[in-house]
UniProtKB/Swiss-Prot annotation:
The gene is glyA. GO terms for biological process: glycine biosynthetic process from serine; tetrahydrofolate interconversion. The keyword Magnesium does not apply. GO terms for cellular component: cytosol. Belongs to the SHMT family. It catalyses: (6R)-5,10-methylene-5,6,7,8-tetrahydrofolate + glycine + H2O = (6S)-5,6,7,8-tetrahydrofolate + L-serine. This is Serine hydroxymethyltransferase. Keywords: Amino-acid biosynthesis, Cytoplasm, One-carbon metabolism, Pyridoxal phosphate, Transferase. The lineage of its organism: Bacteria, Bacillati, Cyanobacteriota, Cyanophyceae, Nostocales. Homodimer. NCBIfam families: PRK00011.1.
Length: 427
């Protein structure tokens, strides 16, 4: 009789096995609308849960500090080659443990403490690692931030240029965590060249769309590109550094190891290789196109129901609901949808009067439920469920109806039907 990994876990540690089982059930029973989350394939899960977790492999393929890396080298080289092919890059480093680690390695390569960086303000849709004062990027470097136009809630490249000319940053950062519109990398490169700055594109949210040719490509215009490998790319949680400059790539490699990390997580790198291989298949482009269409369907229905969206819509996988028009906070909206088994997150909106712990926005995304097979009709229904819940916050009857409709959708599109952990759910 063949024993599975879950059998070993159940026998060894039923408490952890039970909690994993509960998390699996939660993922199955909820509409996952967090824009930065997705469901990776069973093949990626298998790679991450393999014996590769046992192996130390400091260094790069063919140049390790440990013996016994002959198979690890082949796996990591496949991941590198697939990443380069997927994004059209001259160089790829697949070792960063996260997007934040990837960004830090770029800073270590291009900057010295005290240099100036320029990125989008976190409250307008930027990221912690783009100069937030609570992050090392905001502690080690001088920081100036740009935002979106108050009128359009979109990037104003003339304003960004004026700020860059005034501040003269050494590094200009584009790419965001909560910006629903297309980014013009060519315009950013023009601004960077005019002030003598390096240009970094952090495409963590849109990497899958870029790889599918459904968002402009940053590689021809940016000195360095970083991304996570989950989100729209649908791989394991991790980071990736790309560049069109092979010589710069060598410096970036040294900033990853030994500059900022030790041994790479080769089981995760194997998962990245599998995910990159999946993304190179024609079906992935169809998936990415559906992600965009589903986001538009959700956005359109929310607007049809009278809810305000930041920038009045979306070009990618995410949208921000501005709840000020219905006199509600993001914290309250997050709680309301959570009560009917919809997972989202409160988020600041541009020029938000609320604190980051309260916010005036709700961020929604389409990647995860698109992975489960849902299309525009289902996302239109999701829009109606969200609107019904937010516009009737005190109605238990509406809440119960919304919860029933969520369950019906989840039942129609099962998640990981092959996965079972045969232990009772813990009390």
């Amino acid at each position: 009789m063949t024993r599975t990994n879950s059998d070993f876990l159940t026998n060894s540690d039923p408490a952890i096995a039970g909690l994993i089982n509960q998390e699996l059930q939660r993922q199955r029973d909820h509409l996952e609308l967090i824009a930065s989350e997705n469901f990776t394939s069973a093949a990626v899960l298998a790679a991450q849960g393999s014996v590769l977790t046992n192996k130390y492999a400091e260094g790069l393929p063919g140049k390790r500090y440990y013996g016994g890396c002959e198979f690890i080298d082949k796996i990591e080289q496949i991941a590198i080659d697939r990443a380069k092919q997927l994004f059209g890059a001259a160089h790829a480093n697949v070792q960063p443990h996260s997007g934040a680690q990837a960004n830090f390695a770029v800073f270590l390569t291009l900057l010295a403490p005290g240099d100036k960086i320029m990125g989008m303000d976190l409250s307008h849709g930027g990221h912690l690692t783009h100069g937030s004062p609570v992050n090392v990027s905001g502690k080690w470097f001088q920081v100036c931030h740009y935002g979106v136009s108050q009128q359009t809630e979109q990037l104003d490249y003339d304003q960004i240029r004026e700020l860059a000319l005034r501040e003269r940053p050494k590094l200009l950062i584009c790419g965001y965590s909560a910006y629903p519109r297309i980014i013009d990398f060519e315009k950013f490169r023009s601004i960077a060249d005019e002030v003598g700055a390096y240009l970094l594109a952090d495409i963590a949210h849109i990497a899958g769309l870029v790889a599918s040719g459904l968002h402009p490509d940053p590689i021809p215009y940016c000195h360095v590109v970083t991304t996570t490998t989950h989100k729209t790319l649908r791989g394991p949680r991790g980071g990736l550094i790309l560049t069109g400059d092979a010589e710069l790539g060598k410096k970036l490699d040294k900033s990853v190891f030994p500059g900022s990390q030790g041994g790479p997580l080769e089981h995760v790198i194997a998962g990245k290789a599998v995910a990159f291989g999946e993304a190179l298949k024609p079906e992935f482009q169809g998936y990415s196109a559906q992600v965009i269409e589903n986001a538009r369907a959700l956005a359109n229905q929310l607007q049809n129901r009278g809810l305000k969206l930041v920038s009045d819509g979306t070009d990618n996988h995410l949208m921000l609901v501005d709840l000020r028009s219905v006199n509600m906070t993001g914290k309250r909206a997050d709680q309301l949808v959570s009560e009917v088994n919809i997972t989202a997150n409160k988020n600041t909106v541009p020029f938000d009067p609320q604190s980051p712990f309260v916010t005036s926005g709700l961020r929604l995304g389409s990647p995860a439920m698109t992975t489960r097979g849902m299309g525009e009709a289902e996302f239109t229904e999701i829009g109606n469920i969200i609107a019904d819940r937010l516009l009737n916050p005190d109605s238990d009857t509406v809440a119960q109806d919304c919860k029933r409709r969520v369950a019906a959708l989840c039942d129609r599109f099962p998640l990981y039907p092959h996965l079972e952990i045969p232990v009772p759910v813990l009390a």
